[in-house]
Every structure is written in structure tokens, then in C-alpha cells.
Amino acid sequence: MEEHKPIAIHKREWSRTESIERIASRFFIVGEESTGRYSWVVEARSGFSNNDAITLLNNELRELGLVGSLDPRDPPVLSVTERRYGSGILPSWQLGSVWAFSIIMMVFAGGEWAESVGLEGNPYAQSSLFYALPITATLLLASELKRRLNRKAGIESGHLIPLAMPQISPMWWPFGIFGLFGQKSAEHTHVVNRKELAKIEISVPATLFLVGQPMFLVGLLMTPSTPPLELSSAPLAYHGSILPNLFSSLMIDSDHMIRLQWIHPLGLAGLSLSIMGWILMLPIPGLPGDRILSAILGRERHVEMTTQNILFVLSLGVLIAVFVSSDFIPWLVIATIACMRRFGNDQLKPPMIINLSDGFPRESLERYSAAAVMILLLGLPGMSPASEYENWDAGLDPNLWPSS
């Protein structure tokens, strides 16, 4: 009969501190205790980088409801805290219902616009093909890209949730889609390092911007220079950002400003995506732009009172500038939210970075910083991205127009 080796049993039960220290010692050489309940000065064992060691340790700690993080000191200090879970992921049928509802709203909004600009054919069929479909496909692409990046980083985030309005409102929101939300709160997620956070957060705004800009230009090329035959009310004039305006002025000459008053639904879809991508890049708590700023500056520097005061003053300055120079209500609402969230009770915190010891590689830091600035500058929509054309019927005698 085969003999089994006896199992060594400790004479006393380990405390929780000793248990965590023993688990950490599999991947780190654990030194003296640091300040904090479960914290030690550590060094990654031979064959492990700090990134590998903290990732493997967190795989072990996940079952215990704990998460470990490394601070930027040299040697780093390992701190273990309770894992924050937040809300769960929506079931597939609920998520599908929200997407279906938003797509229907897009079809209605695009159909109304297609009818107002005199597009031939059924307006809702034109809307489905040239407005709802391009927007939905781009949003799905951005959502899937972010979901895969999150999954690669060990984060279960699910797909994004879009919200859209059923009409193009010149006063409240003239772009149809007005919201794109994540299912999981950022402050309840744990990202391995600052570079990974920047990569995840820039994925959606960059996708919307890079797809939306050429889509807007193609839609502008498809727009006729002559007005709709049944123009009975003031046209809604859109104002594009720098890149498409520059290219369209070279390709269409001076007609591009006229075409913006009855732009093709495909152009409106591209403009809507570009505007949404630009808004998501703004450094407002809760938006990807603020989390990208946290990745670039570092969480500790980002949440410092000095940094928060500077951001608040900038937000307040923008709010005053918008109030004085623009009558575009959405900008006023967004600037107000930016000020309120910066120091409000419901301030949204950026994700927890579990490995601050490696910092942000300089080359990658410059690349992501440049990308963020480029999107903000090239996508700048101006104080009034859309406005009703004043005195559109000046010099015309409506009494001579045929009536139905």
C-alpha cells in the first residue's frame, strides 16, 4: 500500500495579516511593515516584474475580496485593502432593450431631419440607412473595443449604454444621440497601471472622433448646394470642426457653408459622433477625459487640492465665457455640471491604479497626451455648433408662395 507523506499543520491559527503576508510572499520578497493595516515594503521575486507580481497576487486575493496595490516609492510599498465591487452588469436582454430603444429614437430623429431637408424616398428608410445605422455601428465598434481592452486588463465592464433623443432640437440638443454611459462605475474598477488606464479610456472618444470626422465630410459631399424645394421654416445651420471644414473648403469651395444648412443625414451622423467624442474628452469628473487626465498626471497629483482648484477655476471660466458669448443651452448645462461635479458631494473618483511603481513610460505619456490634445483642438465645435439661420426669408414675399 502506498504511503502518504504527512501534512505539516501549524500549532496556531494564522491571523489575517499573517495570511495575507504569506500569500504576498509567493510573488514578493516581503520586508518590514509599513504604515497601514496590511502594508509592507516589498521587492518582486526573481523572474517577476512588479507588474507581473502584483497581477498574480491580485488573482489570489480576488477570492478573499481583497486587492493589492503598489505605491510609486522605491522600493515600493504593497498595500492590501478591501475590494470594491459596485453595481453588476446588466443582463443581455436588458442591455439589448436599451440599445433597441435608442436605435428607434435615432430612426425617428434622422427621419425628421431627412424629411426637413427634402431627401428623396421614405424618410425613415433614409434615416435607418444613413443616420441610425452608421451611428449604431460606430457605437458598437467603440463599445466592443473598450470591452475587450477592459477584459484584457482583467476588468468585467460589459457594453456601453447609448441614449438618444427622438428629434433634432435646435434649442436643447441638435445631434440626436446625447449620452454614452458605462455599466460599471469607474471608482469601483482596478486598473493595473496608468498606461493601461489611458489606453482604455481614450478608446471610445478616439473611435467616435476618427470615424465621425470622415463620415461628416462624406455626408457634406453628398449634400446638394441647392436648398430643399419645400423649405417653409428657418433652416438649422451646423458648424463643423476644423478638419472637415478645411477639407470641404478645398473640395467644395465656398458651397460647404451653404450645404451645412441642409446637410445629408450621413453628415449629421458623423457630426453627432464627432461632437460626442469631443465631449467625452472634456476633463469633467465621470467622463473619460478626466480619467485620462488622472492617468497622465497620476492619481495622487490629480486629486490634490491644488490641481482640483485649477480645474475648478478653468471650468468656472468656461462657464462664464459660455454664459456671456453663447446662447447654445447645452454648453451652459455641460459647463455647469463640470463646476458642480468638481467639488460636489457626488464627485466621481478615477479608477484605482494597482501598480504605481512603474510610472508612465515617457514615450507613451507623450503619445497619449498628444492624442488627447489633438482631439480636443481639432474637434472643437465652437460656441454655437448649430443655430437657426436668421432672416432666412429676407427679401422674399411669402404671399406669392403656393399654399396647399
Question: Where are the model-predicted features located?
Answer:
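Hydrophobic transmembrane alpha-helices and their immediate loop junctions
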Residues: 1-404
